Design a protein with these regions (language model features):
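Loop-rich catalytic cores of soluble enzymes, especially ATP-dependent carboxylate-amine ligases
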Residues: 5-7, 11-13, 18-179
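Long, low-complexity C-terminal extensions of enzymes
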Residues: 184-185
Length: 185
């Protein structure tokens, strides 16, 4: 028989990216600002257990070989914190709200900030941790969440550091490692 090669990746090495989109139904009573607060730091840092990894860099202005290995295949492609786009000016938190059910009860959280995973365990952790975080936010909208000063910069900082020792700035003026953010959540 003929040899067949199957690739599961999230970027083509030429500046194009595609990923695994997730969708969550969230109680419409939870203000969208609270949804953003609940998930922003999580989406930036969950790559420590759910990133697919890749060799090289595709961040505009950086040489491909400037990063030998990174945690997430998609991190180099995010340019905005929040927005509607999915193919240009990609946001960490997408605002597309098409719940395909009763829109007076639920909103759709359309997630594009995630890698397609080969590992079933990574997929489980990615989806389950996000679902639990959203459920906690619905139960306690006043719950304190870690807030990053520059999430767009932080998502690439975290990805470009497979040692998990890089620190990112918080909104409060301190610094924290990605793994510490996940422990806080």
């Amino acid at each position: 028989g003929a040899e067949i090669l199957i690739h599961k990746n999230n970027s083509d090495g030429k500046g194009n990216s595609y990923g695994c989109h997730e969708n969550y139904l969230v109680d419409r009573g939870l203000p969208f600002g609270k949804v953003i607060s609940a998930v922003m730091a999580h989406f930036v840092t969950r790559q420590v257990f759910a990133g697919a990894g890749k060799v090289g860099c595709e961040l505009p202005g950086m040489a491909s070989d400037s990063v030998s290995y990174q945690i997430s295949q998609r991190a180099d492609f995010f340019e905005e914190e929040v927005g509607l786009e999915t193919t240009v000016r990609r946001p960490i938190v997408n605002t597309r709200d098409e719940p395909h059910c009763d829109p007076s009860k639920y909103r759709r959280l359309h997630v594009i900030a995630g890698d397609a995973n080969m590992s079933e365990v990574a997929t489980f952790l990615k989806v389950a941790s996000t679902a639990m975080l959203l459920a906690a936010a619905e139960d306690d909208p006043m719950m304190e969440m870690p807030a990053l000063a520059n999430p767009v910069r932080a998502i690439t900082q975290v990805s470009h550091d497979p040692t998990l020792t890089a620190v990112v700035s918080t909104y409060e003026g301190t610094t924290v490692r990605a793994i510490e953010v996940q422990w806080q959540l």
